[in-house]
Amino acid sequence: MGGLAERKGIANMNINVKKLKENAILPTYGSSGAAGADLYACLDAPVTIEPGKTAFIPTGLSMEIPEGTAGLIYARSGLACKRDLAPANKVGVIDSDYRGEFIVALHNHGAQSQTVEHGERVAQLVITPVYTPAFIEVEALTDTQRAAGGFGSTGK
């Protein structure tokens, strides 16, 4: 579907990407409406992830996430459902001032070993706006009907 710079959309932007390894693959979108850009494994040799274990999978890329946004690294649904592989921290957060390599901590939630190959799509990157409000200490909060009810308090 093409690289980040080829997209058309409401919030069209470009992201500077630096290849840290010659064989790294730039992120791509799987369809014209995809929210997440696929991130690819950049490996010198296949990596086997044993059941219940986590492996750090490099992408061979670093990026300039625009100020006022963050990059969120999510699981790819097919990889999670078919092979039980998903980011260990569920959602990785890439801050706009981070300039290091994008690495996916991929966890094997299944009962069988899984092998990741170079060029395999291992996660997806979603760019989203970020708000950084000031936190103000107060003596009391405004009352609401829900109040402090949580964990199922609004219904079954």
Predicted regions and their residues:
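DUTPase catalytic domain/fold
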Residues: 2-156
